[in-house]
Amino acid sequence: MPEKRIIIIAGPNGAGKTTFAREYLPVEVGITTFINADLIAVGLSPFAPELAARRAGRLMLEEIDRCGAAGISFAFETTLSGKAYVHRISSWQSLGYSVKLVFLQLRSVEQAMAPDVIARRFKAGLSNFEVLYRPLVNEWQTIDNGRPTPRLLSEGGRP
């Protein structure tokens, strides 16, 4: 039976999470189920996805929970600016999942997309990665995605 895996693609807004995932997930790790609130919002409201952002976020969490309960390997993207996945990670691991976190870094907040809110999320996401999430997951990587070609900065994990 193949290993059940969850890949979390994380990083600040504008770090290129979706672009990175499109290549990395199917080619590098063989995962084709990618859950993304932004893409869900576009499906719900193609001409004004921002109007569907809240609903898309709820649907994303429902789909994450559905895949986890069904034993399906999957991936999703997040800024990690909140603590929504802390308890889920332990739950997934108790269900036999291996959880990998790939954090895409930018050299500075200026490389991210916009001002205030993104600056706060940029700092919160990096802090949450280091303090909350990195100690929980089975594997982690940080990747410099502020260059034309992503570059591995560090990696680690626990059994």
Model-identified regions with their sequence ranges:
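Conserved nucleotide-binding/hydrolysis micro-motifs of P-loop NTPases
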Residues: 27, 39-41, 81-82, 105-109, ...
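Pre-Walker A (Motif I) flank of P-loop NTPase domains
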Residues: 2-7, 70-72
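Glycine-rich phosphate-binding loop used to anchor ATP phosphates in small-molecule kinases
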Residues: 55-106, 121-122
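Conserved beta-strand scaffold positions in the cores of enzyme catalytic domains, especially
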Residues: 34, 99-101, 140-142
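Walker A (P-loop) phosphate-binding loop of P-loop NTPases
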Residues: 14
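Conserved substrate/cofactor phosphate-moiety recognition/catalytic segment
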Residues: 21-72
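Conserved lysine of the Walker
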Residues: 17
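Conserved GTP-binding G-domain of TRAFAC-class P-loop NTPases and closely related GTPase folds
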Residues: 10, 108-159
